Amino acid sequence: MAARQVSLGSITFANDAPFVLIGGVNVLESQQFALDAAAVYADVCRRLSIPLVFKASFDKANRSSIHSFRGPGLSDGLAMLQAVKDTHGIPVITDVHTPEQAAPAAEVCDIIQLPAFLARQTDLVQAMAGTGAVINIKKPQFLSPSQMANVVEKFRECGNEQLLICERGSNFGYDNLVVDMLGFGVMKRCCDDLPLIFDVTHALQCRDPGGAASGGRRSQVLDLARAGMAVGLAGLFLEAHPDPSQARCDGPSALPLHQLEPFLSQLKAVDDLVKSLPALTIQ
Protein backbone atom coordinates (compact mmCIF):
# COMPACT_ATOMS: atom_id res chain seq x y z
CA MET A 1 0.00 0.00 0.00
CA ALA A 2 1.41 3.38 -1.00
CA ALA A 3 1.71 5.87 1.82
CA ARG A 4 -1.02 8.48 1.69
CA GLN A 5 0.09 12.08 1.36
CA VAL A 6 -1.36 15.23 2.88
CA SER A 7 -0.08 18.47 1.39
CA LEU A 8 0.20 21.80 3.17
CA GLY A 9 1.67 24.33 0.76
CA SER A 10 5.22 23.15 0.10
CA ILE A 11 5.09 20.66 3.00
CA THR A 12 4.22 17.01 2.41
CA PHE A 13 3.15 14.68 5.21
CA ALA A 14 3.69 11.00 4.38
CA ASN A 15 5.04 8.05 6.32
CA ASP A 16 7.75 7.45 3.71
CA ALA A 17 8.75 11.12 3.30
CA PRO A 18 11.19 13.14 5.45
CA PHE A 19 9.52 13.89 8.76
CA VAL A 20 7.73 17.17 9.46
CA LEU A 21 8.06 18.82 12.86
CA ILE A 22 4.85 20.00 14.49
CA GLY A 23 6.69 21.92 17.15
CA GLY A 24 6.07 24.82 19.44
CA VAL A 25 4.86 25.59 22.92
CA ASN A 26 2.12 24.15 25.05
CA VAL A 27 0.13 27.34 25.56
CA LEU A 28 0.34 30.96 24.43
CA GLU A 29 1.77 32.60 27.54
CA SER A 30 2.14 35.98 25.77
CA GLN A 31 2.61 37.40 22.29
CA GLN A 32 6.34 37.95 22.74
CA PHE A 33 6.77 34.49 24.23
CA ALA A 34 5.22 32.94 21.13
CA LEU A 35 7.23 35.08 18.71
CA ASP A 36 10.50 34.32 20.48
CA ALA A 37 9.86 30.58 20.63
CA ALA A 38 8.79 30.49 16.99
CA ALA A 39 11.99 32.30 16.02
CA VAL A 40 14.11 29.58 17.63
CA TYR A 41 12.11 26.81 15.97
CA ALA A 42 12.23 28.50 12.58
CA ASP A 43 15.99 29.09 12.73
CA VAL A 44 16.82 25.56 13.87
CA CYS A 45 14.52 23.88 11.36
CA ARG A 46 15.89 26.03 8.56
CA ARG A 47 19.45 24.99 9.39
CA LEU A 48 18.48 21.32 9.58
CA SER A 49 16.14 21.41 6.54
CA ILE A 50 13.22 20.11 8.59
CA PRO A 51 9.73 21.29 7.53
CA LEU A 52 8.01 23.08 10.41
CA VAL A 53 4.45 23.76 11.56
CA PHE A 54 4.39 25.90 14.72
CA LYS A 55 2.03 24.74 17.47
CA ALA A 56 0.48 26.65 20.36
CA SER A 57 -2.83 26.46 22.23
CA PHE A 58 -5.08 29.45 22.89
CA ASP A 59 -7.02 27.60 25.60
CA LYS A 60 -6.09 24.64 27.76
CA ALA A 61 -9.71 23.69 28.33
CA ASN A 62 -9.08 20.36 30.06
CA ARG A 63 -6.83 21.41 32.96
CA SER A 64 -7.23 19.31 36.10
CA SER A 65 -7.69 22.34 38.36
CA ILE A 66 -10.04 25.25 37.81
CA HIS A 67 -7.23 27.48 39.12
CA SER A 68 -4.72 26.44 36.44
CA PHE A 69 -3.67 28.81 33.66
CA ARG A 70 -5.67 28.28 30.48
CA GLY A 71 -4.38 30.82 27.97
CA PRO A 72 -5.49 34.02 26.24
CA GLY A 73 -8.71 32.65 24.74
CA LEU A 74 -9.88 32.30 21.16
CA SER A 75 -9.79 35.87 19.85
CA ASP A 76 -6.51 37.01 21.39
CA GLY A 77 -4.92 33.62 20.82
CA LEU A 78 -5.70 33.55 17.11
CA ALA A 79 -4.32 37.08 16.80
CA MET A 80 -1.08 35.86 18.39
CA LEU A 81 -0.88 32.93 15.99
CA GLN A 82 -1.51 35.23 13.04
CA ALA A 83 1.39 37.38 14.23
CA VAL A 84 3.63 34.30 14.30
CA LYS A 85 2.65 33.49 10.72
CA ASP A 86 3.19 37.06 9.55
CA THR A 87 6.50 37.52 11.36
CA HIS A 88 8.17 34.20 10.62
CA GLY A 89 6.37 32.99 7.49
CA ILE A 90 5.60 29.56 8.93
CA PRO A 91 2.32 27.60 9.06
CA VAL A 92 0.62 27.17 12.43
CA ILE A 93 -1.59 24.66 14.21
CA THR A 94 -3.87 24.94 17.23
CA ASP A 95 -6.43 22.75 18.96
CA VAL A 96 -10.16 23.45 19.17
CA HIS A 97 -12.56 22.29 21.86
CA THR A 98 -16.05 23.30 20.73
CA PRO A 99 -17.80 23.25 17.35
CA GLU A 100 -18.04 27.06 17.40
CA GLN A 101 -14.25 27.41 17.52
CA ALA A 102 -13.56 25.35 14.40
CA ALA A 103 -14.32 27.90 11.67
CA PRO A 104 -12.48 30.91 13.17
CA ALA A 105 -9.49 28.73 14.03
CA ALA A 106 -9.33 27.38 10.48
CA GLU A 107 -9.34 30.93 9.09
CA VAL A 108 -5.98 31.56 10.77
CA CYS A 109 -4.43 28.14 11.26
CA ASP A 110 -3.16 25.84 8.54
CA ILE A 111 -3.98 22.75 10.62
CA ILE A 112 -6.57 22.39 13.36
CA GLN A 113 -6.23 19.70 15.98
CA LEU A 114 -8.84 17.43 17.54
CA PRO A 115 -7.86 16.87 21.20
CA ALA A 116 -7.50 13.30 22.42
CA PHE A 117 -10.18 13.63 25.09
CA LEU A 118 -12.67 14.89 22.46
CA ALA A 119 -11.92 12.56 19.56
CA ARG A 120 -15.33 10.85 19.71
CA GLN A 121 -17.41 14.03 19.93
CA THR A 122 -19.37 13.88 16.69
CA ASP A 123 -20.56 17.50 16.68
CA LEU A 124 -16.97 18.69 17.00
CA VAL A 125 -15.78 16.29 14.29
CA GLN A 126 -18.48 17.54 11.92
CA ALA A 127 -17.62 21.17 12.54
CA MET A 128 -13.91 20.61 12.05
CA ALA A 129 -14.40 18.51 8.93
CA GLY A 130 -16.62 21.21 7.45
CA THR A 131 -13.80 23.76 7.48
CA GLY A 132 -11.88 21.83 4.83
CA ALA A 133 -8.70 22.34 6.85
CA VAL A 134 -6.04 19.73 7.44
CA ILE A 135 -6.95 17.95 10.68
CA ASN A 136 -4.57 16.42 13.22
CA ILE A 137 -6.50 13.74 15.12
CA LYS A 138 -5.05 12.89 18.52
CA LYS A 139 -5.62 9.26 19.55
CA PRO A 140 -7.32 9.15 22.94
CA GLN A 141 -5.37 7.52 25.73
CA PHE A 142 -8.33 5.20 26.29
CA LEU A 143 -8.67 3.91 22.70
CA SER A 144 -6.81 1.02 21.13
CA PRO A 145 -4.87 1.89 17.97
CA SER A 146 -7.35 0.03 15.75
CA GLN A 147 -10.28 2.07 17.11
CA MET A 148 -8.82 5.16 15.43
CA ALA A 149 -10.34 3.84 12.21
CA ASN A 150 -13.78 4.85 13.50
CA VAL A 151 -12.68 8.43 14.18
CA VAL A 152 -11.11 8.65 10.72
CA GLU A 153 -14.30 7.29 9.15
CA LYS A 154 -16.35 10.04 10.81
CA PHE A 155 -14.21 12.70 9.17
CA ARG A 156 -14.40 10.98 5.80
CA GLU A 157 -18.17 10.66 6.02
CA CYS A 158 -18.22 14.41 6.70
CA GLY A 159 -16.23 15.05 3.52
CA ASN A 160 -12.71 15.68 4.82
CA GLU A 161 -9.81 13.48 3.68
CA GLN A 162 -7.04 15.87 4.77
CA LEU A 163 -6.23 13.88 7.88
CA LEU A 164 -3.23 13.23 10.10
CA ILE A 165 -3.38 10.67 12.92
CA CYS A 166 -1.40 11.23 16.09
CA GLU A 167 -0.20 8.80 18.77
CA ARG A 168 0.21 10.26 22.27
CA GLY A 169 0.42 7.21 24.51
CA SER A 170 -2.06 4.86 26.15
CA ASN A 171 -3.30 4.49 29.70
CA PHE A 172 -1.25 1.99 31.69
CA GLY A 173 -3.03 1.40 34.95
CA TYR A 174 -3.73 4.58 36.90
CA ASP A 175 -1.89 7.87 36.35
CA ASN A 176 0.59 6.58 33.80
CA LEU A 177 1.03 6.38 30.04
CA VAL A 178 3.05 4.03 27.86
CA VAL A 179 3.74 4.04 24.13
CA ASP A 180 3.09 0.72 22.39
CA MET A 181 5.48 0.66 19.44
CA LEU A 182 3.42 -2.13 17.83
CA GLY A 183 0.50 0.30 17.80
CA PHE A 184 2.16 2.52 15.21
CA GLY A 185 1.89 -0.18 12.57
CA VAL A 186 -1.66 -1.04 13.64
CA MET A 187 -2.75 2.58 13.24
CA LYS A 188 -1.15 2.79 9.80
CA ARG A 189 -2.88 -0.37 8.59
CA CYS A 190 -6.29 0.40 10.08
CA CYS A 191 -6.27 3.97 8.79
CA ASP A 192 -5.09 3.25 5.22
CA ASP A 193 -1.54 4.47 5.88
CA LEU A 194 -2.58 8.01 6.70
CA PRO A 195 0.34 10.20 7.80
CA LEU A 196 1.23 9.22 11.37
CA ILE A 197 2.46 11.80 13.88
CA PHE A 198 4.04 10.94 17.23
CA ASP A 199 3.36 13.34 20.11
CA VAL A 200 6.41 12.53 22.18
CA THR A 201 5.80 15.36 24.64
CA HIS A 202 2.43 14.27 25.98
CA ALA A 203 3.42 10.61 25.89
CA LEU A 204 5.88 11.48 28.67
CA GLN A 205 3.16 12.56 31.08
CA CYS A 206 2.64 10.82 34.39
CA ARG A 207 0.52 12.02 37.25
CA ASP A 208 0.92 12.48 40.95
CA PRO A 209 -2.19 10.57 42.14
CA GLY A 210 -3.10 13.38 44.53
CA GLY A 211 -1.89 16.29 42.42
CA ALA A 212 -3.72 18.85 40.32
CA ALA A 213 -1.23 18.95 37.45
CA SER A 214 0.51 16.41 35.24
CA GLY A 215 4.06 15.38 35.94
CA GLY A 216 6.44 14.25 33.24
CA ARG A 217 9.62 12.42 32.30
CA ARG A 218 11.48 15.03 30.29
CA SER A 219 14.82 13.25 30.76
CA GLN A 220 13.54 10.36 28.62
CA VAL A 221 12.27 12.41 25.68
CA LEU A 222 15.21 11.53 23.43
CA ASP A 223 14.88 7.79 24.11
CA LEU A 224 11.20 7.78 23.25
CA ALA A 225 11.55 10.06 20.22
CA ARG A 226 14.35 8.00 18.67
CA ALA A 227 12.36 4.81 19.19
CA GLY A 228 9.31 6.32 17.52
CA MET A 229 11.26 7.68 14.56
CA ALA A 230 12.65 4.21 13.91
CA VAL A 231 9.15 3.00 13.01
CA GLY A 232 8.86 5.44 10.10
CA LEU A 233 6.74 8.49 10.86
CA ALA A 234 5.31 11.35 8.85
CA GLY A 235 5.95 13.78 11.68
CA LEU A 236 6.94 14.45 15.25
CA PHE A 237 4.87 16.57 17.65
CA LEU A 238 7.06 18.36 20.19
CA GLU A 239 6.66 21.09 22.79
CA ALA A 240 9.58 23.04 24.22
CA HIS A 241 10.00 25.91 26.66
CA PRO A 242 12.88 28.29 27.41
CA ASP A 243 12.55 27.45 31.12
CA PRO A 244 10.40 24.35 31.68
CA SER A 245 10.39 24.89 35.44
CA GLN A 246 8.47 28.13 34.85
CA ALA A 247 6.10 26.86 32.13
CA ARG A 248 2.44 27.65 32.70
CA CYS A 249 1.42 24.13 31.60
CA ASP A 250 3.15 20.74 31.18
CA GLY A 251 6.63 21.98 32.02
CA PRO A 252 7.78 18.55 33.29
CA SER A 253 7.33 17.11 29.78
CA ALA A 254 8.71 20.06 27.80
CA LEU A 255 12.10 19.98 26.07
CA PRO A 256 14.41 22.83 27.14
CA LEU A 257 14.35 25.12 24.12
CA HIS A 258 18.13 25.58 24.05
CA GLN A 259 18.50 21.84 23.36
CA LEU A 260 16.21 21.87 20.32
CA GLU A 261 18.95 21.73 17.68
CA PRO A 262 20.98 18.80 19.04
CA PHE A 263 17.74 16.96 19.79
CA LEU A 264 16.39 17.36 16.26
CA SER A 265 19.78 16.59 14.72
CA GLN A 266 19.69 13.11 16.24
CA LEU A 267 16.10 12.50 15.15
CA LYS A 268 16.82 13.63 11.62
CA ALA A 269 19.71 11.15 11.46
CA VAL A 270 17.40 8.31 12.56
CA ASP A 271 14.68 9.36 10.12
CA ASP A 272 17.12 9.64 7.21
CA LEU A 273 18.54 6.19 7.94
CA VAL A 274 15.19 4.45 8.32
CA LYS A 275 13.79 5.94 5.12
CA SER A 276 16.91 5.05 3.13
CA LEU A 277 16.32 1.34 3.74
CA PRO A 278 14.45 -0.81 1.19
CA ALA A 279 10.89 -1.78 2.02
CA LEU A 280 10.64 -5.22 3.61
CA THR A 281 7.31 -6.91 4.30
CA ILE A 282 7.32 -9.90 6.64
CA GLN A 283 4.22 -12.11 6.47
Swiss-Prot record:
Q: Which GO terms describe its cellular component?
A: cytoplasm
Q: What is its EC number?
A: 2.5.1.55
Q: Name one GO molecular function term.
A: 3-deoxy-8-phosphooctulonate synthase activity
Task: Name the pathway.
Answer: Carbohydrate biosynthesis; 3-deoxy-D-manno-octulosonate biosynthesis; 3-deoxy-D-manno-octulosonate from D-ribulose 5-phosphate: step 2/3; Bacterial outer membrane biogenesis; lipopolysaccharide biosynthesis
Keywords associated with the record:
Cytoplasm, Lipopolysaccharide biosynthesis, Transferase
Show the SUPFAM superfamilies listed in the entry: Aldolase
Q: Where in the cell is it found?
A: Cytoplasm
The chemistry this enzyme catalyses reads: D-arabinose 5-phosphate + phosphoenolpyruvate + H2O = 3-deoxy-alpha-D-manno-2-octulosonate-8-phosphate + phosphate
The EC class name is: transferase
Q: Does the record carry Transferase as a key word?
A: yes
Question: Does the record carry tRNA processing as a key word?
Answer: no
| Entry's Gene Ontology BP terms | keto-3-deoxy-D-manno-octulosonic acid biosynthetic process
Q: Note the PANTHER family from the entry.
A: PHOSPHO-2-DEHYDRO-3-DEOXYHEPTONATE ALDOLASE
Family to which this protein belongs: Belongs to the KdsA family.
- HAMAP family attached here? KDO8P_synth
| Record protein name field | 2-dehydro-3-deoxyphosphooctonate aldolase
Species assigned in the record: Synechococcus sp. (strain WH7803)
Q: What is the lineage of its organism?
A: Bacteria, Bacillati, Cyanobacteriota, Cyanophyceae, Synechococcales
